Design a protein with these regions (language model features):
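DEDD superfamily 3′-5′ metal-dependent exonuclease/proofreading module
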Residues: 1-76
Length: 76
């Protein structure tokens, strides 16, 4: 049960946390363009929680699963 809850929170953060720096500063992580996420994946994600969140968003985008975030957007 704990893992399911954690995954839900991980996804929720993508529609609530904003990018803290760079060209896409203040944009929701879920709204970052795929080409930027690909660049970050090649260049290296930042350390810590933000890097983990960006890596998750990259995986979601790369696998064509952005639609998974739509119900979470509607909740907010």
């Amino acid at each position: 049960m704990h893992n399911t809850r954690m995954r839900s929170l991980d996804l929720e953060c993508l529609v609530t946390v904003t990018m803290p720096f760079g060209k896409y500063k203040d944009r929701l992580l879920a709204d970052l363009p795929g080409n930027y996420l690909n660049w970050l994946a090649r260049a290296g994600f930042p350390r810590g929680e933000l890097g983990r969140q960006l890596a998750l968003m990259h995986e979601i985008d790369h696998n064509g699963l952005r639609g998974l975030l739509d119900p979470l957007r509607k909740r907010g």
